């Protein structure tokens, strides 16, 4: 079907992963806003109208205070995926830092494209959580959350990585923790969750083959508190258990190879 607007098709001759493709997308995007919609998700017919309408309600003189607008997601069984805000019945106007402190899960995000000019997702694995991209850029900006579901996510789609049983993307997980779970967000965790977060960080770092000294320097939480180094053996035991159970997939190795060898093509329609 021929669209009534320009389409840019970006293709790779091998699997290259979401961060690399997202970076290519942002390099070629030329609209006022960016919105992400993965291949196993779909926007409802009025989604764009609702999001743009929400943005247009912000006075022009205050646009620079906001990163954009957000809305809720559910799966195809009606189960809310934007955890923490599923019962919210009104529009919420808050800071991105506060929103993400209370928000776990997925949401529909429409952001100002000018905010991500020359910004890049970390290319360290086939997958890295989007929060490690959002947090450094958006934390001090405001966002408006619409209480409507505008996107349906298919969690049963072939190849879905949302709930895989393998230990994959470990390097990406380690980097994501080091960027996202700092300062304000880490301080809000209770003691048990803090200990579990640090233990898993060591686990992911080991499985992702991030060197010991580098993993310390990457995350301010462990570099500033040497006591967290005592949890390194616990992370090592979990990593060893994962290996013995045959759960570990070294996706970062495949990514490193693909990132050096891939050929990208960009076609304008």
What are these regions (language model features)?
Residues 1-11, 56:
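Acidic donor-binding segment of Leloir-type glycosyltransferases
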Residues 12-29:
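Glycine-rich, basic loop-to-helix element that forms the pyrophosphate-binding segment
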Residues 34:
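Short aromatic/hydrophobic "clamp" motif used to bind/position activated sugar donors
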Residues 38-42:
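The conserved acidic donor/metal-binding loop of glycosyltransferases
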Residues 46-83:
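Conserved donor NDP-sugar-binding/catalytic core segment of glycosyltransferases
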Residues 82-164:
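Conserved nucleotide-sugar donor-binding catalytic segment
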Residues 147-269:
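C-terminal subregions of glycosyltransferases and related glycan-biosynthesis enzymes
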């Amino acid at each position: 079907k021929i669209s009534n607007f320009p389409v840019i098709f970006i293709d790779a001759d091998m699997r290259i992963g979401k961060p690399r493709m997202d970076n290519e997308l942002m390099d070629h995007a030329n609209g006022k806003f960016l919105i992400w919609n993965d291949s196993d998700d779909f926007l409802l017919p009025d989604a764009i109208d609702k999001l743009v309408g929400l943005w247009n309600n912000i006075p022009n003189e205050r646009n620079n205070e906001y990163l954009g607008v957000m809305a809720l997601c559910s799966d195809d069984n009606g189960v809310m995926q934007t955890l923490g805000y599923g019962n919210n019945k009104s529009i919420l106007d808050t800071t991105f830092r506060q929103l993400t402190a209370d928000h776990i899960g997925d949401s529909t995000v429409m952001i100002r494209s000018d905010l991500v000019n020359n910004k890049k997702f970390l290319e360290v694995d086939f997958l890295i959580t989007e929060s490690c991209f959002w947090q450094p850029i958006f934390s001090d900006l405001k966002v408006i959350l619409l209480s409507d579901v505008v996107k349906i996510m298919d969690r049963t789609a072939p190849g879905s990585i949302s709930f895989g049983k393998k230990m994959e993307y470990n390097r990406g997980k380690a980097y994501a923790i080091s960027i996202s779970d700092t300062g304000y967000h880490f301080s809000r965790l209770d003691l048990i969750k803090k200990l579990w977060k640090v233990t898993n960080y060591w686990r992911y770092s080991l499985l992702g083959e991030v060197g010991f000294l580098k993993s310390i320097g990457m995350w301010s939480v462990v570099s500033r508190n040497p006591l967290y180094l005592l949890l390194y053996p616990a992370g090592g035991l979990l990593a060893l258990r994962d290996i013995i159970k045959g759960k570990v997939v070294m996706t970062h190795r495949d990514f490193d190879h693909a990132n050096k060898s891939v050929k990208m093509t960009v076609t304008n329609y």
